[in-house]
């Protein structure tokens, strides 16, 4: 009997189970370890707020490599009014994508039972992975399981400020259960501060606006930049995989020269044009150039790569014009309670708000994840240039955990490939 352990049951864990079940091999047992019940979509795709929308067009959001229209077909069948409105190039609400993931999972569970797939869902957190002759997992309740293969499909958590701060008016984790009241019953005539000005901040701003918010919003981030508008791809044939051998500086100069000579394009189109070869470019950079990119260019990449729907950005821009939204550039040095207010201190000023929301992105420091830290201490994982990599032939990483190896690996198109690759190794 071969035992496969899946740790984590978000998008990657669910789609991995679906593919393993569909291609089930006899004498295989699948163990799924997650604190969340298997039929529930993750918080990021739940109904916390119907205003939160995907940042990728519907036509690119199928969970399956071999069924490219699967999500679009789901929309057309179960949300026909929305489908008529947005079409394949539109952006669906996140909670509807959560419904889609639940839908395909439920169908897979029915099929798995019909095929007598041997699987078990264990509602426990894995706190230790070790090897004593065989690979084994220890759970928070002390139970241990010996397994043959381990797939780490754990999700990223949200980054936090480097100092402690607590307040009933501080949303520390945007996707936690404790944030439900803020999402569903937001304060409508207060001053709200946002830590960060990326896609999560845009989500919160739009949700407040659609809830008839009449107060003021102050977004604070290191660079003070908002996401750019999404666009229909223009034909740009500039960067080749072979260019990677010349290094990051060469690529920057090549792009700068092109944009100077072709003012009808901007950096979004150039970055969009290398979408399908980003991983190959990253694989062909040496360690020196990877570190140079991460040190000097990653913030600009994030601004121009991670775009928001045009309607969303225009609504945010109108709020800035109307004075309802202010975006400030600065590093936060301290946050403290001052009476009923929250004081945010940057290098240049003190900002007072009534409520504060953490809109920072993912946490990429491996030592902030208990299980990853433990596995590194056991030498089952190794630190790489961003996160971690496997140091054991029977431990496989899925999705965003491969960011150091692949760089571009957190969007659904890359996640599907990652899942397919791991399935090929397991079967």
Write out the residue ranges for each language-model feature.
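N-terminal glycine-rich dinucleotide-binding loop that anchors FAD/FMN and/or NAD(P) in oxidoreductases
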Residues: 46-70, 235-250, 311-317
């Amino acid at each position: 009997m071969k035992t496969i352990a899946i740790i984590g049951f978000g998008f990657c864990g669910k789609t991995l189970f679906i593919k393993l079940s569909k291609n089930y091999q006899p004498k295989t047992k699948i163990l799924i370890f997650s604190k969340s019940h298997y039929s529930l979509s993750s918080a990021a795709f739940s109904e916390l707020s119907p205003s939160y929308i995907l940042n990728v067009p519907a036509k690119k959001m199928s969970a399956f490599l071999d069924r490219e229209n699967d999500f679009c077909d789901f929309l057309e069948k179960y949300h026909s009014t929305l489908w008529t409105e947005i079409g394949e190039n539109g952006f669906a609400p996140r909670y509807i994508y959560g419904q889609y993931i639940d839908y395909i999972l439920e169908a897979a569970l029915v099929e798995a039972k019909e095929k007598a797939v041997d699987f078990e869902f264990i509602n426990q957190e894995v706190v230790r992975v070790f090897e004593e002759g065989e690979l084994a997992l220890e759970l928070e309740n002390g139970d241990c399981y010996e397994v043959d293969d381990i797939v780490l499909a754990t999700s990223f958590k949200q980054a936090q400020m480097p100092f402690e701060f607590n307040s009933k008016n501080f949303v520390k984790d945007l996707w936690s259960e404790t944030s439900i009241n803020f999402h569903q019953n937001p304060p409508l005539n207060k001053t709200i501060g946002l830590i960060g000005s990326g896609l999560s901040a845009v989500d919160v701003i739009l949700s407040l606006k659609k809830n008839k918010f009449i107060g003021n919003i102050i977004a604070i981030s290191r660079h003070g930049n908002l996401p750019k508008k999404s666009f229909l791809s223009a034909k740009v044939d500039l960067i080749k995989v072979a260019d990677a051998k010349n290094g990051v500086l060469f690529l920057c100069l090549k792009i700068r020269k092109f944009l100077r000579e072709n003012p009808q394009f901007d950096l979004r189109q150039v970055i969009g044009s290398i979408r399908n070869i980003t991983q190959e470019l990253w694989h062909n950079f040496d360690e020196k150039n990877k570190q140079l990119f991460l040190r000097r260019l990653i913030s600009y990449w994030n601004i121009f790569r991670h775009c928001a729907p045009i309607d969303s950005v225009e609504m945010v821009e109108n709020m800035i014009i109307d004075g309802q939204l202010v975006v400030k550039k600065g590093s936060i040095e301290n946050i403290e309670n001052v009476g009923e207010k929250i004081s945010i201190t940057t290098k240049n000023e003190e900002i007072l708000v009534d409520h504060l929301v953490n809109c920072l992105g993912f946490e990429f420091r491996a030592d902030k994840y208990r299980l990853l830290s433990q596995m590194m201490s056991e030498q089952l994982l190794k630190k790489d240039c961003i996160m971690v990599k496997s140091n054991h032939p029977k431990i496989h990483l899925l999705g965003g955990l491969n960011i150091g190896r692949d760089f571009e690996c957190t969007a659904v198109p890359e996640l599907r490939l990652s899942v397919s690759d791991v399935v090929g190794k397991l079967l």
